[in-house]
Amino acid sequence: MALWGGRFTQAADQRFKQFNDSLRFDYRLAEQDIVGSVAWSKALVTVGVLTADEQRQLEEALNVLLEEVRANPQQILQSDAEDIHSWVEGKLIDKVGQLGKKLHTGRSRNDQVATDLKLWCKETVRELLTANRQLQSALVETAQANQDAVMPGYTHLQRAQPVTFAHWCLAYVEMLARDESRLQDTLKRLDVSPLGCGALAGTAYEIDREQLAGWLGFASATRNSLDSVSDRDHVLELLSDAAIGMVHLSRFAEDLIFFNSGEAGFVELSDRVTSGSSLMPQKKNPDALELIRGKCGRVQGALTGMMMTLKGLPLAYNKDMQEDKEGLFDALDTWLDCLHMAALVLDGIQVKRPRCQDAAQQGYANATELADYLVAKGVPFREAHHIVGEAVVEAIRQGKPLEALPLADLQKFSHVIGDDVYPMLSLQSCLDKRAAKGGVSPQQVAQAINDAKARLAL
């Protein structure tokens, strides 16, 4: 059943109908559309459009429909209705007859779909926040179990300074905490109800929109009807949140893919999140992580696509806005799936401490410690930096780590170097000295773990 037709003397071409219809994806808004319709029926009682008995009949029928949808949402796709609003109204009329035709009084699909989508976004944000915090918790637990796992930290994918696997985990906790904060901010801004704004100019019925917003669980009602039906900022914000969040997950995946590789060998992934090769029997491929990394691109594409859709639209509603849903649904589904999968990857990961330790001791990762030692002896840092660079060249020439160079060789580069230099070049010393807030010292890492556990109520 089309919700429009009196103006037309010819039926729509079937090809246009298929091109125009949105039920194949906006069926996901069925529950929100029904909930919004119940609230709207209550509002119509306050302005005398419906009697209390009529509203009761409508609400009962809508609640029955809601249970039917929850039991089998796929049934909606068997219909040839134009969109979810048409489907809900048609089903309601099937249940209550002519009374169902009164429900749309004073309401437009423009404010209706805007409300439905915001309700869906609010529910989905809560799911994302839960999954985000679950992954943060998994990272904190992994960090706590690996505080003593020393490994090389990298810049330019070159070994730079020693860190711990725990410190690496906590870096991603920080990223995820920012993702959490962005979602919470987005939720605050989208928590305003457009219902009652009509097609663009507002409703002709003196409905208390603040009361209506409260019935739907919104913090307040929107202030401008023209903006309300054309606003998709919340879609852009959520897509941006997802794009940034997926960048973080992609980096997480890339790190672990490298750590898991034969070249690094720092970790081994569980069999539960890896797959094999159809040809090479020895292979154990990090498919879960590669898919997380690969799915990042589709989320970035959804954000770019939506921005291009909106950039040239005049006020108010335009059918272009129908393009807001598929990209949003897919992007947030993808992000949610990847958050869950990242947590699963951490469940059962094995950190190979001896291999991590060996790698941390290679690559002259303690060179900065030698420079700091010279600074403590009164050598200006820039000069110390140059001296250590020369010492590293000599160590490479001899095929030795810095700490294995004889004192006489080290003193060729600076006479201030004494026997006390060797304890300073140990991995433990490298870690212990990074004791300022946010550093990699055992005390700072332990404090960061405790702080994260308190914030996450672990």
From Swiss-Prot:
PANTHER family: ARGININOSUCCINATE LYASE. This is Argininosuccinate lyase. It catalyses: 2-(N(omega)-L-arginino)succinate = fumarate + L-arginine. InterPro entries: Arg_succ_lyase_C (IPR029419), Argininosuccinate_lyase (IPR009049), Fumarase/histidase_N (IPR024083), Fumarate_lyase_CS (IPR020557), Fumarate_lyase_fam (IPR000362), Fumarate_lyase_N (IPR022761), L-Aspartase-like (IPR008948). HAMAP family: Arg_succ_lyase (MF_00006). One of its GO terms (cellular component) is cytosol. Pathway: Amino-acid biosynthesis; L-arginine biosynthesis; L-arginine from L-ornithine and carbamoyl phosphate: step 3/3. It is an enzyme of class 4 (lyase). Belongs to the lyase 1 family. Argininosuccinate lyase subfamily. GO terms for biological process: arginine biosynthetic process via ornithine; L-arginine biosynthetic process. It holds the Pfam family ASL_C2. It comes from Salmonella heidelberg (strain SL476). It is found in: Cytoplasm. Keywords: Amino-acid biosynthesis, Arginine biosynthesis, Cytoplasm, Lyase. It comes from the Bacteria. Its EC number is 4.3.2.1.
